[in-house]
A protein has these predicted regions:
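Long, low-complexity serine/threonine/glycine- and acidic-rich segments characteristic of extracellular
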Residues: 1-59, 72-83, 87-89, 93-180
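Proline-enriched interdomain boundary motifs that mark the N-terminal boundary
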Residues: 64-75, 182-187
Length: 187
C-alpha cells in the first residue's frame, strides 16, 4: 500500500523530505520500500533508485486537534458558485490542506477520499489515486475527477477527505446541469 507519493527538490545533489503516516496503518514490525526518481530542470537527465533496507515499527505520539482538513471545492472553474449551472459532465476539483497531513493512502475502513453524487452508492467514487500533494508538502494537495454524464436538473455532490489523525471533513456542492451548456475552461 502506498503511504506517500510526493515531490521535492534536489539541492547540491542531496534531497530530504518529510511526510506524515496515517494513524490507522498496520503498525506491525516490518520493512518498507521507497522508490525515487528525479529529473533535471531541462528534462535531459533522469535518475532512479530504491531503498528497501529500512524498518517500520511504531509511531510518534501526536496531539489530535480533532479538526478535519480544510477543503475548497468547485466544479469546472474556481468562479463556480454553489447552486450554479454546469454542463452534463462537469469536472470536480478540490484543494485540501491540514497542518497534520492529509490521508491519501486510503488505509483504514472508510478513510478514502470519496465523492458521492445525489447520495447514491452507485455514484460514489474513490479519488485517492487522483490526489497529488503540492510540491514539497505533505499538508496540502489537490484531487480532481471528471463526473460521468448527469441528467438535466438539480444535483448534489458530497466530497469527504481525512487527515492523518482520522479526522474527516465533508463539503457539499449543489448544482444544476443544463444540457448543451459549454463548460467554462480553466487551466
Amino acid at each position: 500500500k502506498v503511504l506517500y507519493n510526493g515531490t521535492d527538490s534536489i539541492r547540491r545533489g542531496e534531497f530530504t523530505f518529510t511526510f506524515a503516516v496515517p494513524r490507522d496503518i498496520n503498525y506491525a514490525p516490518g520493512t518498507g520500500l521507497m522508490n525515487f526518481s528525479a529529473i533535471n530542470e531541462n528534462h535531459t537527465l533522469m535518475a532512479q533508485g530504491h531503498e528497501e533496507g529500512f524498518g517500520i515499527d511504531g509511531s510518534e505520539t501526536v496531539y489530535n486537534d480533532s479538526i478535519g482538513p480544510s477543503i475548497y471545492a468547485y466544479l469546472n472553474t474556481p468562479s463556480f458558485v454553489d447552486g450554479g449551472e454546469v454542463n452534463c459532465t462537469p469536472y470536480f476539483f478540490a484543494q485540501i490542506t491540514d497542518k497534520d497531513g492529509i490521508n491519501a493512502s486510503g488505509n483504514g475502513i472508510g478513510h478514502d477520499m470519496q465523492l458521492t453524487i445525489d447520495g447514491k452508492l452507485t455514484q460514489t467514487y474513490v479519488l485517492n489515486d487522483n490526489f497529488r500533494y503540492d510540491f514539497g508538502s505533505y499538508t496540502s494537495g489537490s484531487t480532481g475527477y471528471s463526473l460521468p454524464e448527469l441528467s438535466e436538473g438539480h444535483h448534489t455532490l458530497q466530497f469527504r477527505a481525512w487527515d492523518i489523525l482520522n479526522n474527516p471533513s465533508t463539503v457539499t456542492l449543489h448544482f444544476k446541469v443544463v444540457k448543451g451548456l459549454a463548460p467554462e475552461i480553466y487551466s
